[in-house]
Regions:
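Helix-to-loop junctions at the C-terminal end of transmembrane segments
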Residues: 68-81, 171, 288-300, 384
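Juxtamembrane intracellular "pre-TM" segments in multi-pass secondary transporters
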Residues: 1-15, 205-241, 420
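C-terminal ends and interior cores of transmembrane alpha-helices
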Residues: 91-108, 310-323
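Hydrophobic core of transmembrane alpha-helices in multi-pass small-molecule transporters
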Residues: 26, 110-127, 326-340
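C-terminal membrane-cytosol helix-exit motif in multi-pass small-molecule transporters
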Residues: 188-209, 402-411
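Intracellular juxtamembrane helix-capping segments at the cytosolic ends
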Residues: 127-140, 340-353
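Helix-loop boundary and gating motifs at the non-cytosolic
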Residues: 5-67, 237-277
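Transmembrane alpha-helix termini and helix-breaking/packing motifs in multi-pass membrane transporters
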Residues: 162-179, 375-391
Length: 420
């Protein structure tokens, strides 16, 4: 078989809904990372320097709202289908970026309050996330889940990094405030294009019951009840995997909320060079995504899951007292952490959880994970104000319980025993 035939066979599942989602992610991932290098500095300039817990409060509000909508999101995705949530909420997410554009003009209160409002609206729109992940699992065959997941993460890494570079150049060229406004205008337009493209999605869950918006509120108690009950019927491994996933989200939040400020104020990295720290992640994600996906499919899911926390600890050690170059390596390693842990976790969950329960499981993981992420951001911001290095050392300390759980509590089913 020639190279072309091999590629066609290996990626034959890239079609339909999966292909539509990939194209939309290319647009959205390029856009969403554009403001990342200078987001912390933007909030700082809009009044965050006067109120030093602004970043932590915005981060907590972001993930608290995401947690609030995660459970009904999973329930509604399983009950009524995926598409009806994904498409409208992608349009609404695009509109939320308008708050980020006009924030510098806001005079009634501190300008960063408008960032807070836009963030809350954006977080509510992410009620569609469980539907999104469930649609991916519905659309990728069992034997290709590792590669399918890795392609998603490769897209995140590949198109994130050009976004950070272009966003960084705009900010350096136009100045912090005008540059970030230009960046958020581009983000708004690209999200609008992605939402329009997602109109092509086809529903994967057939349900003839009419959808009513009152279910957003009336279904909440039922959603909580069903989301709790589903944990009684899934294998115990899924519960331990859940603990590892939410611990990972918490540990990453501890440092993500202050890493740019830490690099500027503690390590002395010049603000106009900070965006360069994200460049090596591009090469890393492109090179590593496919091999890690094949590793998950061929070698198994537990080994890459165990490698992830060790890479995380290494990344933190490189960041704590590093320079621009060691920070580049550190951020590239964080990309590997996502590849190892998310690819293996998604594949393991897909082969152990029935399709009709995947939305609820994802919603449950997101619910607890988002609360812990918000708490991690507040705690990370607080610890930074006490002693700047504390968030990094706490992250390293939490690697040990994660490793113990993965090694001794998570079991991987044999291929012949996988039902889904």
């Amino acid at each position: 078989m020639g190279l072309t035939g091999l590629i066609q066979r290996e990626f034959s599942f890239v079609r339909g809904n999966y292909l539509t989602l990939i194209v939309s992610w290319v647009l959205m991932d390029f856009a969403v990372e554009m403001p990342v290098p200078y987001y912390q500095q933007y909030v700082d300039a809009l009044g965050g320097n006067v109120f030093p817990m602004a970043l932590g409060i915005i981060g907590f509000a972001n993930f608290f709202v995401m947690a609030f909508v995660a459970v009904p999101g999973g329930f509604l995705a399983d009950k009524f289908g995926r598409r009806w949530l994904i498409v409208p909420m992608t349009f609404a997410t695009a509109l939320s970026y308008l708050f980020f554009i006009v924030a510098p003009f806001w005079q009634l209160t501190a300008s960063w309050h408008l960032i807070l409002i836009g963030t809350i609206l954006q977080s509510f729109c992410l009620i569609y996330q469980p539907a999104l992940f469930a649609m991916v699992q519905d659309s990728v065959p069992q034997e290709s889940r590792g590669v399918g997941s890795s392609i998603i993460h490769m897209i995140h890494g590949t198109f994130n990094t050009p976004g950070t570079i272009i966003g960084g150049i705009l900010v350096v060229t136009l100045g912090l405030i005008a540059g970030m406004q230009a960046v958020y205008l581009i983000v708004f337009l690209l999200f609008l294009a992605a939402a329009t493209w997602r109109l092509k999605l086809k529903e994967t869950i057939v349900n003839h019951e009419k959808i009513r918006f009152r279910y957003f509120l009336s279904s909440y108690s039922q959603a909580i009840r069903e989301s709790l009950n589903v944990w009684k019927i899934v294998p115990r491994t899924i519960l331990w995997l859940f603990i590892v996933q939410v611990l990972t989200m918490f540990t990453l939040a501890l440092t993500n909320v202050i890493n740019a400020i830490y690099a500027r104020d503690i390590l002395g990295v010049p603000q106009d060079q900070w965006y360069l720290a994200y460049v090596p992640m591009l090469v890393t994600m492109i090179i590593a995504s496919y091999p890690i996906g094949k590793m998950v499919d061929k070698v198994g899911m537990k080994l890459p899951l165990a490698i992830g926390p060790m890479v995380l600890a290494t990344s933190m050690f490189l960041f704590i007292s590093g320079n621009l170059y060691s920070i580049m390596v550190s951020i590239a390693l964080l990309g590997l952490v996502h590849l190892f842990m998310m690819s293996s976790a998604m594949a393991l969950s897909a082969c152990l959880v029935e399709p009709q329960n995947r939305g609820k499981i994802t919603g449950g993981v997101n619910f607890v994970g988002y609360i812990l992420t918000g708490a991690g951001m507040v705690l990370g911001n607080l610890l930074y104000n006490i002693a700047s290095y504390l968030p990094f050392y706490l992250t390293i300390a939490l690697v040990f319980p994660m490793m113990l759980i993965i090694i001794f509590r998570i079991s991987e089913p044999k291929k012949e025993d996988r039902k889904y």
